[in-house]
Amino acid sequence: MVGGEDFTHGNTLIFDAERDAFLYTPKFLDAIVAVGRQSGALNWQAGGRFGSFTDEDGDTIDPDRAYDVDGPNRTWWSHAHMSHAWADGFVLYDNGTHHSPLVSRVAAYTWDVEAATLKRTFEFVNESGIYDPILGDVRKLDGGNYLVAWTMSGSMTEITPAGEVVWRMSVELGSGVGRTGYVPTLYQVTYQ
């Protein structure tokens, strides 16, 4: 596509029951958009060139600089995958395609959708400086830790809110871990 972006390449689609909307992250727009389930209308956009949200410093992304994704406090993201959102926040896997140096990270945010503001509350970069140009995923676990799939390295980690790695897994095949989820047990245990 000459002079344009593939806006239909969606990395994520999540249903937000509280707002009766779908949250969609189009890869090349570097944004999160909310689309009304009933109306199909664009409710709002966070991030990207034309996003209406501001960060904690009041910064937005200049529409004339499409890839000014970091902002003064590295608030923004690039080519992210967001699999987990809740009423006042979300966590995403920031592929980091427009960061310098190229490095992927986990970033969690609080947001106020009505005020159109967001604040980064957590950031973690893998100690080996992994850059995943594709895929990657993160979920916030019930206890507050984050479960991360570092796709290209074929590894997963569980990270505390303090940034401590408490669990790690690697697969011999390399880039074989895409989306992640937590399964508490593979067995249903019943006692008589």
Regions found by a protein language model. Give the residues of each.
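Histidine-/acidic-rich catalytic cores in large beta-rich domains
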Residues: M1-Q192
